[in-house]
Amino acid sequence: MPDSRPDTELSNPQSAKAPLDPHLKALENESIHIFREVAAEFERPVMLYSIGKDSSVLLHLARKAFYPGRVPFPLLHVNTGWKFREMIAFRDETAKKYDLDLIEHINPRGAAENITPFTHGSAAFTDIMKTEGLRQALDAGQFDAAFGGARRDEEASRAKERIYSFRTPDHRWDPRNQRPELWNVYNGMIRKGESVRAFPLSNWTEVDIWRYIQAEDIPLVPLYYAKKRPFVERDGMMILAEDPRLELLPGEVRQEGMIRFRTLGDFPLTGAIRSQATTLEEVIAELEIATVSERQGRAIDRDQSGSMEKKKREGYF
């Protein structure tokens, strides 16, 4: 029987320390500049924290930007109730270790109505538990700027989003009504009720993220590294089969194999990949020959009626 205890140690598999090359240093400098600009321009910034690798890099950069002081804004985790167990344990340990002001929000309507990815489908579940939940949390905190970890190389709609992404009072995004950004000069002037999503990692790639994690020895959720884990194949994805809420459908068989995740989200909507990469070096080598986006492992991105751009227009991350 596999060990059911989540592996949450805040450290990475043994890796040779890599120096920060000029390319990564330039990306780091740009990201730190964006953090400081937003903190100076806006009254109530917040950082969206989804616990994944991009959020871990984002947090590391925020800590660098304001060192030796504490991170001067809270972290917001919109919890759907369906995250991997390892993610929640890692989140709590990270918040304690770095003395972070962590806000957790769960959409009370979704919880009361028992909205699940199994009963309502990925599109409705994401809209209610993530998009609606995020809007609720931003309104409750009266935040006028929210840092996010999106990168332009992830997906088409994110590729055309500016570093300062302006949102209406109801948090909607109009990609045709965004301001020009000249070099590193950002216009943060907003009207009452409007807000900005700021993306310090916009110009990073997935490989940049991993090389920076290696160079800076940034801890990650262990699910990013290959390990023998139980899974079921469903809708063309390998779904982790550790949570008792995952019921096998007719014809499904529980399997075990060496798998890992390139992206993390809600466990029923996030597919693993077969992999032997158990170290940072092996993950990077694997990514350097990858031919598909990491977002291919997200069920919510496969549904054309719930495409990423549509979600973002409505207020999604």
From Swiss-Prot:
Domain of life according to the entry: Bacteria
Enzyme class: transferase
One Gene Ontology MF term: ATP binding
Catalytic activity: sulfate + ATP + H(+) = adenosine 5'-phosphosulfate + diphosphate
InterPro entries: PAPS_reduct_dom, Rossmann-like_a/b/a_fold, SO4_adenylTrfase_ssu, Sulfate_adenylyltrnsfr_sub2
Ranges where the record places region Disordered: 1-21, 298-317
GO biological process: hydrogen sulfide biosynthetic process; sulfate assimilation
Keyword Nucleotide-binding: yes
Pathway recorded for this protein: Sulfur metabolism; hydrogen sulfide biosynthesis; sulfite from sulfate: step 1/3
HAMAP family: Sulf_adenylyltr_sub2
Family matches, as NCBIfam families: CysD, PRK05253.1, PRK12563.1
Described purpose of this protein according to its UniProt entry: With CysN forms the ATP sulfurylase (ATPS) that catalyzes the adenylation of sulfate producing adenosine 5'-phosphosulfate (APS) and diphosphate, the first enzymatic step in sulfur assimilation pathway. APS synthesis involves the formation of a high-energy phosphoric-sulfuric acid anhydride bond driven by GTP hydrolysis by CysN coupled to ATP hydrolysis by CysD.
Subunit details: Heterodimer composed of CysD, the smaller subunit, and CysN.
Similarity section: Belongs to the PAPS reductase family. CysD subfamily.
Protein name: Sulfate adenylyltransferase subunit 2
Name of the gene: cysD
